[in-house]
Amino acid sequence: MKRGIFLSIILGLCLITCIPQVMAQKQSRMEKLLRYLNDNDADKWQKNREKLDDETQTYYSEELALLDVLHQLWNEHSEQAATNYFGCYGKAFQGNFSTICDEEKIQLSDVRNRAEQSIIYILEGSKDKIPFSRAVIDSIRSTDYPADSVMLQRLRDIRELALLEGMLKTPTPGTYQTYLAEYPNGKFIAQVNAAENKRLYQLVEKDPSSGNFKAFFDNADMQKFFRDKDSRPYLAEVRSLYDNFLFQHIDSLQKEGNATAIRQIIDDYKHTPYLTAAARTHLDDLEYLSEKADFELLKPAIVNSESLSLLKDFLCTHHYKE
């Protein structure tokens, strides 16, 4: 029994002695990976990464995930890695990553700076800057990553320029509203509003419909922006298009003989806030159609001699007697 106790003690001492050595070996492998990565030695990085045993990968899973992301950032310029980096950094920092850096005499701040510069480089070269920049910014906000104000401002500047370029090349309501929401006093607010105004005009020009005219005239953001300006570009052109649009609609209704609809649209034409007095170029043309529509509406009411007074009143107030 004494011998069994003695052996147990010996075994315990061996374990106490061996465990730190094993852990030191595992950490040493991680330190080498960081060194190869930091020194841009891609071949040694890849070979040692592939040889890493399962136990080391499991124990240092968070640190290894960060090293993999750094490899993808620095050597593969991966956009996905750029969005994954911030979360991976936070988890690895809570683990042993700072210790691994200290052992290799690599400044943690240098690792961060290099990663951030890589992300900026990848973002600037991206073909999808708008969604990509949003993903990067959201990733920073959702983690405790210690991003400084300089980097955050750089990201915002890149995103703002990307939104402007989007409005100039392929303007959409979504891009416009995003810019207004994120940069209400942005550097490019004038260009962005001008691009949206042009988009609204081109919609009307291509498809002169009631909905498109309403979108141009009733756009609150456009009204607010151009309120203090000398004039709104394309306003005269759109008024001219709307003037012709209403007149053509009246003409088509007249051919159908729908007096009620004609009367309504003529009233709309005369009183619409979208047109100035000078922009209503068809008033003379509509006078006859207007009185004709009134007469057609009057006809059903003239049923006997007593209702002839209605006709008399009509003749007193209307020019066209035929």
Predicted regions and their residues:
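Bacterial N-terminal signal peptides that target proteins for export
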Residues: 1-9
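Bacterial N-terminal signal peptides
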Residues: 8-17
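Sec/Tat signal peptide C-region and signal peptidase I cleavage site
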Residues: 19-24
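Conserved small-residue packing positions in alpha-helical repeats and bundles
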Residues: 33-36, 65, 69-70, 118-124, ...
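Helix-turn-helix repeat elements of alpha-solenoid scaffolds
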Residues: 37-49, 75-95, 127-135, 169-174, ...
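N-terminal, post-signal-peptide region of Sec/Tat-exported proteins
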Residues: 42-75, 101, 199
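Short solvent-exposed coil/turn linkers within tandem alpha-helical repeat scaffolds
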Residues: 51-61, 89-110, 137-155, 180-191, ...
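Fold-core signature of tandem repeat domains
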Residues: 155, 163, 167, 176-183, ...
